[in-house]
Amino acid sequence: MRKNCFLRLAALLLVALFIGSLLPLSSMAAPIKLSYANFPPAPTFPCVQMERWKKEVERKTGGQVAINTYPGGTLLGAKNMMDGVIAGQADIGNLCMAYQPGRFMVTNATALPVGFPNATVASLTLWDLYKKYNPKEFAKVKVLTMFTCAPANIYAKVPVRTLEDLKGLELRASGGVAQVLSALGATPVAMPQSETPEALQKGVVKGAASSLETLMDFKYAEICKYVTIFNGPVYPFAVVMNMDKWNSLPKDVQAVMAGLGTEQAWWTGNYMDKHVDKSVEWSKKNHSIEIIKLGKKEQAEWNKLVKPLIQNWITQAKAKGLPARAFVRDIRVAKDYHSRF
């Protein structure tokens, strides 16, 4: 009897060993640990999308991957994000391409004042542009997704209904948004976001131009009672992975990450748009702000004044041997397509 029990136990062990040998090694091994660097503070939308992507990858790989996230520049800063990922200081990094306009010429074309209606449309357009042209500046990394912030709009202590209202108006702005405001006749003033509330209170600036979640997040609605919608520029972002690290991943893990590219671009844009909507509703309910929408004729006048900015960019890009007009054409086509949904 004891001999038969021993034989049955041995047989069960052999079966277990055989079944175990059939399991993929990736499911038996310890989780693959990856580091993900980000530069803005944890509550901001680039970090919110980072945490969402982390959870999706960990869930869809069945625990094969464990991702440690580093917001707020704790691992890599904004200006050295791309080079830091290439060097392997972080496995994954999120960068704002607008901070290096000359380096990311193709994808930064989405920062031109083409009139994106929201972040979802802009994010999907950016992703389409990248996938079509596969710019050489990303040859040393694996691009996981791209997305944008919401379009910049004007909020001020005085109403802006026409170009005449905008003329000479001091507004806090930076980068491409500042260039657009200058073209429209305003006076852009560069300053950190943290200094803007005091500058508004003291009258150093009469308002600002940025995406409208700041009305609630920075409480600008307490001071600026007028919002003018003109669908200004967006800032493009990219999430990239060290190429050696990417090549070391199991094929099934690569497939999960690659499959999230378009979904993550849409999710981030949609999250941003919902946050903007919430901010605007909060501002209307709690601070009675007025939303000013330009009429077709007035909007056409604004668009006419920013056209030279687009033409200047085309000239610069063509000088670098890039098919600049094709980029702008494709951006407009993609914008119109994604705006239908």
Q: Can you name each region flagged by the protein language model?
A:
Residues 30-120, 136-341:
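N-terminal secretory/targeting leader peptides
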Residues 117-133:
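A gly/proline- and charged-residue-enriched helix-loop-helix capping module
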Residues 10-24:
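Bacterial N-terminal signal peptides
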Residues 25-29:
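Bacterial Sec-dependent signal peptides at the C-terminal "C-region" and cleavage site
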